[in-house]
Each structure stands twice: as structure tokens, then as C-alpha cells.
């Protein structure tokens, strides 16, 4: 079954909003910060093993006085002001997240980088058909280089999901509720089905975007 694009009127409140660059930047920074593990750790002079004994007597050697071989300026000593495990996540209001997603989608829509298909029509998983569908939509460059695509699928479209997931990191498959500012900006083109577009519009129209 051939994949057919459809003409739809995209809601202006979501796809024709003013692009707010500072807001997008703030939300993307918060999203990337939340993705950090924050497990970095170094030992201070009190945590490094050893160093309890004074290396040499206080006076009479002609050398600078030293109290421990684990001081930061000693080889094998602790680290002064080094990193410790921490949580980098930032609380971002839901309204800001929603507004940033809308700004990013409006930017893509303004550059004609959003495509809507009627339905994918995969009854069995087929990577070959997935590649053919992308080529039929004109989403491969002349040199056959794969553009970065975001394909928005429904949970029930399992065969379609299995077909596209083999195409590598340049094809990002997301659910409507997983659409986020960073992924929208990372991808060159976004492909909705009529069903997932309706779900996305319902989600963003009601302002229920999740916190980052």
C-alpha cells in the first residue's frame, strides 16, 4: 500500500505561533541538564587512603612543613574542590515546556518541514517498505543521504514501528506525548499521520505537556 500525503489545515495556535528563541534555549538547556547522570566523583584529602602520618618532622629539614602526603598538592593526594555527585535537573514550568514545543513546531511548519500522511498501512514489518515510503515522500537527498527524521507514531502501529526502527539513529520514532523541543530542533523533518497529528493537537492545545 502506497503512502499518501494529505493536505490539512494546521492549527495556527500550535503551528503558526511566534518563535521564541530565548524560551526554546532555556527549555533545551533544562532538558539536557536533566539528562546528565551527575555521577562524577573525586576524593578529598580526608577520603583518600593513607596520609595519616606526618611525612617528616616539622623543623630542621630545610623543607616546607608538611602535615600529610594526601594534601591536594601532593602526588596521590586528594582533590581540592573536585566534582561530587549531584542532580543537575532544573524545574521547568509546564507552560514553558508547552510554549517551547509550540515555538519549535511553528519554526518547522514555517519552513515547510512538516509532512502529514493519511496512514502508513504496514500490515507486517518491512524495513524495505519503510525506506521506499521515505523516498516516496521525498525525504531523502539527491545523494541518497538520509535526513534526520522524526516520525510520530501511535502505540497501536507496532508493525510500522518495527519497520522504521531499523533505519538507524537518523530516524527518531516518538509517540505524540513524547514530542519535545530538543528532538524537534534536532530533526530536519517531522512526519505525522492524521491520527497522531490529532493527538498532538489535542495534547498541546490543552496545555498538558509534561515537565522536563
Language-model region placement:
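A short, flexible low-complexity segment enriched in Lys/Arg and Gly/Pro that occurs
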Residues: 22-59
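Glycine/serine-rich anion-binding loops at beta->alpha junctions
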Residues: 45-81
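Extended polybasic, low-complexity segments that bind anionic RNA or targeting/receptor surfaces
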Residues: 1-37, 83-212
Amino acid at each position: 500500500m502506497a503512502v499518501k500525503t494529505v493536505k490539512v489545515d494546521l492549527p495556527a495556535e500550535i503551528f503558526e505561533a511566534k518563535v521564541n528563541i530565548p524560551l526554546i534555549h532555556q527549555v533545551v538547556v533544562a532538558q539536557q541538564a536533566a539528562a546528565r547522570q551527575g555521577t562524577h566523583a573525586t576524593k578529598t584529602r580526608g577520603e583518600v587512603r593513607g596520609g595519616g602520618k606526618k611525612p617528616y618532622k616539622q623543623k630542621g629539614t630545610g623543607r616546607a612543613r608538611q602535615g600529610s602526603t594526601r594534601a591536594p598538592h601532593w602526588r596521590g593526594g586528594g582533590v581540592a574542590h573536585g566534582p561530587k555527585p549531584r542532580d543537575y535537573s532544573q524545574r521547568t514550568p509546564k507552560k514553558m515546556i508547552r510554549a517551547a514545543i509550540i515555538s519549535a513546531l511553528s519554526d518547522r511548519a514555517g519552513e515547510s518541514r512538516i509532512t502529514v500522511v493519511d496512514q502508513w498501512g504496514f500490515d507486517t514489518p518491512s524495513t524495505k517498505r519503510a525506506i521506499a515510503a521515505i523516498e516516496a515522500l521525498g525525504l531523502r537527498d539527491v545523494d541518497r543521504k538520509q535526513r534526520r527524521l522524526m516520525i510520530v507514531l501511535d502505540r497501536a502501529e507496532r508493525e510500522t514501528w518495527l519497520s522504521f526502527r531499523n533505519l538507524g539513529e537518523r530516524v527518531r520514532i516518538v509517540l505524540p506525548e513524547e514530542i519535545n523541543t530538543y528532538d524537534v530542533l534536532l530533526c530536519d523533518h517531522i512526519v505525522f499521520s492524521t491520527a497522531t497529528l490529532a493527538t498532538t493537537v489535542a495534547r498541546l492545545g490543552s496545555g498538558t505537556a509534561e515537565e522536563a
